[in-house]
Amino acid sequence: MTSLDPAPNKTWELSLYELQRKPQEVITDSTEIAVSPRSLHSELMCPICLDMLKKTMTTKECLHRFCSDCIVTALRSGNKECPTCRKKLVSKRSLRADPNFDLLISKIYPSREEYEAIQEKVMAKFNQTQSQQALVNSINEGIKLQSQNRPQRFRTKGGGGGGGGGGNGNGAANVAAPPAPGAPTAVGRNASNQMHVHDTASNDSNSNTNSIDRENRDPGHSGTSAASAITSASNAAPSSSANSGASTSATRMQVDDASNPPSVRSTPSPVPSNSSSSKPKRAMSVLTSERSEESESDSQMDCRTEGDSNIDTEGEGNGELGINDEIELVFKPHPTEMSADNQLIRALKENCVRYIKTTANATVDHLSKYLAMRLTLDLGADLPEACRVLNFCIYVAPQPQQLVILNGNQTLHQVNDKFWKVNKPMEMYYSWKKT
């Protein structure tokens, strides 16, 4: 027994944990305990490379395990100490190989290549979900989705407004004139064909009128030819004017009923006279009225679009004011009410002047509450009991030696416009009130 005792100059000092812990019971039967690989990871991991131990080396002094290459490199390039507990390691002679631990690892993980493949998959999945690049990609995808949805929303609103007001465009394509009694029904004449008919009729009437004028000026022609030309022109003009006038007026009424509301509905033009000289004016008036109605429908559609956009952007004014407009403030104690003998000033000492930069839509009440909270946090126990309840009055000095008390619901934007029109930090004063 004496041979097993440690040498007198080499004593093993037990730690508090080793002194207090109870020994674990030895398993003597065939009981198996299921242990997850994650719980074993910290035991089988090298503290230097954070990977599974390879060619395990154990320190003789503190019994910490490392990979052979890792600990040799650490001793060669760093301090001569254990990377885990900083105990002194002189050289490689302070290490010993641990083949039993390598055998244990090989029993748990027979194939190291399979283990490394699993670890690579886990790290790849982790990088996809948790890395900085994944965050950037997620933000970019969100911006793309927002940019795609925004034009679709505006196009839908524009199409809904244009469908009601665009009666003179595609809406007039399927408008049919009411049939006369005993006459066949006309279907599928659009607005461009109607304008083409009006232009053709006006050109025919102009050519007939010009031919009549030339024959009247030419004395060499016989009276019979002139009379026949006049008769043919007069016969053609009433028929064409009557047909075109009836179809135009009926079509205009249908288009007006379909496109214009009752308040802006235009009345149909009267049927022109049989004279051929008024025919071009009739065509021009029809075109002018159509253009004016198109402009009215476009203006109505623009009004709808503007209304929709106003509804979408409603409530953004205050946000833009609070973000874009910032005001710098210099808070000073009131020169008379917050004199040197004031309890709060004695507690504040050199912290009585405050420099603040805030948004323009902040109110005077916000500043008062900020001062109360800030001074309470800064002073803490130094704040006298009489000053525990902090109520402040806020003043502004538009002129030297002139202090104006401010209302609590006034915003800094209003105060700046009314009292302070100088491009420098606004000077404000505060006084402590007991009530």
Curated annotation (Swiss-Prot):
UniProt pathway: Protein modification; protein ubiquitination
Pfam families listed in its UniProt record: RAWUL (PF16207), zf-C3HC4_2 (PF13923)
Record InterPro entries: RAWUL, RING1/RING2, RING1_RING-HC, Znf_RING, Znf_RING/FYVE/PHD, Znf_RING_CS
Positions of modified residues (Phosphothreonine): T267
Enzyme Commission numbers on file: 2.3.2.27
GO MF entry, a single one: ubiquitin protein ligase activity
UniProt keyword annotations, A-Z: Cell cycle, Chromosome, Meiosis, Metal-binding, Nucleus, Phosphoprotein, Repressor, Transcription, Transcription regulation, Transferase, Ubl conjugation pathway, Zinc, Zinc-finger
Main location: nucleus
Transcription regulation among keywords: yes
Chain positions of all zinc fingers (RING-type): 46-86
Compositional bias (Low complexity): 171-188, 202-211, 222-251, 259-278
Biased amino acid composition, Acidic residues: 309-322
Record PROSITE patterns: ZF_RING_1 (PS00518), ZF_RING_2 (PS50089)
Subunit structure: Interacts with ORD. Component of PRC1 complex, which contains many PcG proteins like Pc, ph, Scm, Psc, Sce and also chromatin remodeling proteins such as histone deacetylases. This complex is distinct from the Esc/E(z) complex, at least composed of esc, E(z), Su(z)12, HDAC1/Rpd3 and Caf1-55. The two complexes however cooperate and interact together during the first 3 hours of development to establish PcG silencing.
Function: E3 ubiquitin-protein ligase that mediates monoubiquitination of 'Lys-118' of histone H2A, thereby playing a central role in histone code and gene regulation. H2A 'Lys-118' ubiquitination gives a specific tag for epigenetic transcriptional repression. Polycomb group (PcG) protein. PcG proteins act by forming multiprotein complexes, which are required to maintain the transcriptionally repressive state of homeotic genes throughout development. PcG proteins are not required to initiate repression, but to maintain it during later stages of development.
Protein's recorded name: E3 ubiquitin-protein ligase RING1
Species per Swiss-Prot/TrEMBL record: Drosophila melanogaster
Gene: Sce
